[in-house]
């Protein structure tokens, strides 16, 4: 469902005073002249009369307001999970904020609100917005988000120290990723950011300094520069048949081990090594719904890199005699990128046939047919298949490739993923359609109906 508006009014798309649950919704082009561009959430009591907003798999885009361009909430009673915030604008002149809480929880309820994990922002992607993202108050948890390339970062005002920002990527958000109100005691745990902006964080799980590392392998959106290009994240990308896009983490060719990554395996499922109920533990699944391991260190940010064989779909093409098949395997690499051909010899030695390695250290494994063509693969995952003549039938095989993720496997056999492939070749279709003439002369529609009537009689006659 998509909610949108273009006309000006005091409040935006939704005015809420109850419990509002949103799933698989786009809230776009909301506008309020003052507060609440997309949602105005009313209620200053913590009892059942106060409004509460829960949003999962929701896109907030192009919403504007002086304050609370996405949500204006009288209390911080909102929970955004697996959600996209992009291109929204808080237009106020002083401390304008996208997710704005007018007042804090009272002292008696604050700690309970934090431990309930019901309020805050998790497993979400936030980019290209204008204004502070949220004013972080006591009782809120910000966890496993990717927040980059916004006009401003967080405005932090949690004097009791019962607010948490953890396991997140917070980078290149205006002049400062974090601005602290007087007396703020927000706890920062295990975030990738500029520590000069957001502090060193918790002594046990401190923040990670991003330093001079290139953030994106390409532009803000679109194509990801192929390995060995630098860039901690791929640009924002919306896969086919998906609702939410994301910035995918990358394992760079300069990494010798997984521990060299600033993102992968840097979050903690068990923050202190023992207590899974810790407020700083990773979310159990990522923004896409993919499970984060409960036995190993997880990835910080909204996306967990997962080698999921079940997510690999068959590739291929149907062609006619004289044609060449062209298709891509870029979306079938199980979160990885093809290993550059220049790296293959050092890992595997020379090819047995003496030919040069292709991208991904490609191996073609025939399945149900002998080889009937020649296949080439470039670094970006584009495949060109040239058949050996005009044969009629199929060529079935597996493309066995090594990726920037699988190269870290201890076993050579586990360093490959298999992508099923099939080329079907047919002769040109020279059949010409023959049309029955039903007009002109005495044999027309009337006679045709009469014949159909006889057919009916024969069918039911006994």
Description of each model-found segment:
Residues 7, 21-24, 41, 57-61, ...:
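Predominantly extracellular beta-rich ligand-binding scaffolds that present long acidic/polar faces
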Residues 1-23, 31-46, 73:
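Extracellular beta-strand-rich solenoid/capping regions of secreted or surface-exposed proteins
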Residues 391-406:
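A short beta-strand micro-motif common to beta-rich folds, especially ectodomain repeats
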Residues 332-381:
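Surface-exposed or secretory-pathway low-complexity segments enriched in glycine-proline
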Residues 307-315:
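Proline-enriched interdomain boundary motifs that mark the N-terminal boundary
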Residues 298, 303, 405-434:
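C-terminal edge beta-strand
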């Amino acid at each position: 469902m998509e909610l949108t508006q273009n006309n000006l009014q005091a409040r935006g798309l939704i005015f809420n005073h109850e419990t509002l649950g949103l799933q698989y919704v786009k809230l776009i082009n909301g506008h309020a002249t003052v507060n609440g561009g997309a949602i105005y959430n009313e209620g200053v009591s913590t009892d059942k009369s106060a409004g509460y907003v829960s949003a999962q798999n929701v896109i907030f885009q192009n919403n504007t307001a002086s304050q609370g361009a996405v949500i204006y909430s009288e209390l911080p009673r909102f929970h955004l999970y697996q959600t996209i915030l992009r291109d929204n604008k808080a237009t106020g002149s002083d401390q304008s904020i996208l997710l704005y809480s007018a007042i804090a929880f009272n002292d008696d309820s604050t700690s309970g609100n934090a431990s309930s994990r019901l309020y805050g922002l998790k497993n979400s992607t936030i980019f290209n917005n204008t204004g502070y993202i949220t004013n972080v108050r006591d009782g809120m948890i910000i966890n496993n988000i990717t927040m980059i390339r916004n006009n401003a970062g967080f405005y932090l005002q949690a004097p009791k120290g019962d607010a948490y920002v953890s396991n997140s990527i917070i980078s290149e958000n205006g002049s400062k990723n974090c601005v602290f109100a007087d007396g703020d005691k927000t706890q920062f745990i295990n975030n990738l950011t500029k520590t000069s902006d957001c502090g060193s964080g918790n002594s046990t799980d401190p923040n990670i300094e991003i330093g001079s590392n290139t953030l994106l392998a390409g532009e803000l959106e679109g194509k990801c520069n192929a390995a060995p290009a630098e860039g901690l994240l791929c640009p924002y990308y919306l896969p086919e048949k998906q609702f939410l896009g994301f910035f995918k983490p990358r394992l760079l060719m300069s990494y010798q081990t997984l521990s060299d990554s600033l993102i992968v395996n840097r979050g903690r499922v068990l923050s202190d090594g023992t207590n899974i109920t810790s407020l700083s533990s990773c979310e159990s699944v990522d923004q896409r719904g993919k499970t984060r391991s409960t036995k190993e260190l997880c990835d910080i940010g909204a996306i967990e890199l997962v080698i999921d064989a079940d997510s690999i779909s068959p590739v291929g093409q149907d062609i006619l005699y004289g044609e060449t098949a062209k298709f891509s395997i870029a979306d079938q690499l199980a979160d990885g990128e093809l290993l550059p051909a220049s790296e293959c010899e050092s890992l595997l030695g020379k090819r047995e046939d003496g030919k040069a390695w292709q991208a991904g250290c490609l191996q073609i494994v025939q399945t149900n047919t002998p080889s009937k063509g020649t296949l080439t693969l470039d670094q970006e995952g584009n495949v060109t298949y040239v058949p050996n003549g005009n044969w009629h039938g199929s060529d079935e095989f597996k493309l066995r490739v090594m990726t920037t993720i699988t190269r870290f496997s201890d076993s050579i056999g586990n360093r490959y993923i298999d992508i099923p492939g099939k080329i079907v070749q047919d002769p040109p279709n020279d059949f010409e359609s023959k049309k029955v003439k039903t007009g002109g002369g005495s044999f027309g529609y009337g006679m045709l109906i009469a014949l159909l009537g006889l057919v009916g009689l024969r069918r039911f006659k006994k």
